[in-house]
Amino acid sequence: MVRLVYFAWVRERIGLTQEDVALPADVLTIAGLIAWLATRGEAYAHAFEAGASIRAAIDKTHAKHGALITGAREIAFFPPMTGG
């Protein structure tokens, strides 16, 4: 099981702040997880439709979409950050 945490409009579109899920064995990266999540229903598809722009963190450390998620306890998703 891994805890998925959602922030900002990702959270608003899904309607959850977090959830614990058992990942399929073939989901090995952030990109794979985003693709899998997008298949879980209309709300998830809407939240992850801009998959390439969504940022992620594995166990509170920013991660690229190619990062392996094996052994992760928590994966967070949030929109791109801006600021000065």
Language model features with spans:
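Ubiquitin-like/PB1-type beta-grasp interaction modules and other compact soluble beta-rich domains
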Residues: M1-G83
